[in-house]
C-alpha cells in the first residue's frame, strides 16, 4: 500500500505498512503468511507499548543499551549534554573525557589486574576484537600458528563471521558456512545433562576437563584463546569452580582466557 492509501486508518497500520515495504528486521521471517511487523512506540521502566496501546514486558532489554530501563530522564539529559558538547570523536590515538573517565571507572570495578579498557561497538565486535588481539599477541611473541579459539556448545558469542564461528548454536550458523576456520567446540556446562555427573550431587568438572583435552588434542600450539560466557543466556549455567579451574588451565597451557 502507498503512504496515502485510504485503507490505512491508523498510525499503527501506516507504520506497519511502511515496515513491510522497507524494514528488514533482524531474525525476521520473510514469508507472506507471517503476521506483519509489530510497531513498538515507547517504553517506561521494564515495559514497552506498541502503537495500538498494548503493553509488553521488555525481555530484550539486556541486549544493548536499555538495561537500566526505558524513559529515564537523567539518562536522556546525560546523552543530550554529551551530544551538545561532543557528539563523536574516535579514540584511535586520542582520548576524550567521557571515554577516559569510563575506562578508569571500569578498571576500578574490575577484579585483579584488569586495568585496561578497549571499547567496541557491541558484543559481536568485542568477540571479534578479542580473537584478533589474541592472534596478534601470539604473533608478536613469535608464535604465529596460535590462531584457534575454543568455545562451548550452545554458547552465544555474536553474529559477525568470526563471532558466529565461535558461537555454538548450529541453527543460526549453518546457512552461512563455511565460517572462519579455527573454532573448536567442547561440551557445555550443563549439570542436568552432563553424561558424567548428572546423577551426582556435585559437578565433576568434566566440562572444564574437556577444554584441556581439546587444547591438548589441537597441539596445544595452535590454540590462542578460550572463550567463555560467565553469564549465559543461550546455553547453560557456568559454575564458579569452572571459572577458577579454567583460569588456572589457561595459565598452565599458555592460552588466553576471554570472558
Give the ranges of each region predicted by the language model:
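Active-site and channel-lining beta-strand-loop segments
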Residues: 37-58
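A short, flexible beta-alpha/helix-coil linker loop
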Residues: 62, 85-86, 190-193, 230-234
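Short acidic, glycine-rich surface-loop motifs adjacent to enzyme active sites
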Residues: 218-237
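Active-site-adjacent loop/helix segments that line or gate small-molecule/cofactor pockets in enzymes
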Residues: 2-44, 94, 99, 207
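PLP-dependent aspartate aminotransferase-fold enzymes
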Residues: 104-224
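Catalytic PLP-binding core of fold-type I/II PLP enzymes
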Residues: 220, 238-259
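Glycine-rich loop-to-alpha-helix module at the N-terminal edge of alpha/beta enzyme cores
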Residues: 2-5, 12, 55-143, 150
Amino acid at each position: 500500500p502507498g503512504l496515502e492509501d485510504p485503507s490505512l486508518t491508523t498510525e499503527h497500520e501506516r507504520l506497519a505498512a511502511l515496515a513491510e515495504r522497507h524494514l528488514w528486521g533482524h531474525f525476521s521471517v520473510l514469508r507472506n503468511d507471517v503476521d506483519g511487523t509489530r510497531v513498538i512506540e515507547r517504553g517506561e521502566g521494564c515495559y514497552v507499548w506498541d502503537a495500538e496501546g498494548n503493553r509488553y514486558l521488555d525481555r530484550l532489554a539486556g541486549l544493548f543499551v536499555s538495561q537500566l530501563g526505558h524513559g529515564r530522564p537523567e539518562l536522556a539529559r546525560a546523552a543530550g549534554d554529551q551530544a551538545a558538547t561532543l557528539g563523536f570523536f574516535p579514540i584511535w590515538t586520542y582520548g576524550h573525557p567521557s571515554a577516559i573517565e569510563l575506562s578508569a571507572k571500569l578498571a576500578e570495578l574490575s577484579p585483579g589486574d584488569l586495568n585496561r579498557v578497549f571499547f567496541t561497538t557491541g558484543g559481536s565486535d568485542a568477540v571479534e576484537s578479542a580473537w584478533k588481539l589474541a592472534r596478534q599477541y601470539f604473533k608478536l611473541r613469535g608464535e604465529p600458528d596460535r590462531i584457534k579459539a575454543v568455545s562451548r556448545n550452545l554458547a552465544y558469542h555474536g553474529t559477525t563471521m568470526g563471532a558466529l564461528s565461535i558461537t555454538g548454536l548450529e541453527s543460526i550458523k549453518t546457512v552461512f558456512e563455511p565460517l572462519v576456520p579455527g573454532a573448536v567446540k567442547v561440551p557445555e556446562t550443563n549439570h542436568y545433562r552432563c553424561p558424567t555427573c548428572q546423577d551426582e550431587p556435585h559437578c565433576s568438572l568434566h566440562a572444564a576437563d574437556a577444554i584441556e583435552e581439546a587444547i591438548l588434542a589441537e597441539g596445544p600450539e595452535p590454540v590462542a584463546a578460550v572463550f567463555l560466557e560467565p553469564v549465559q543466556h543461550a546455553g547453560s549455567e557456568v559454575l564458579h569452580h569452572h571459572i577458577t579451574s579454567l583460569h588456572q588451565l589457561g595459565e598452565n597451557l599458555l592460552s588466553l582466557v576471554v570472558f
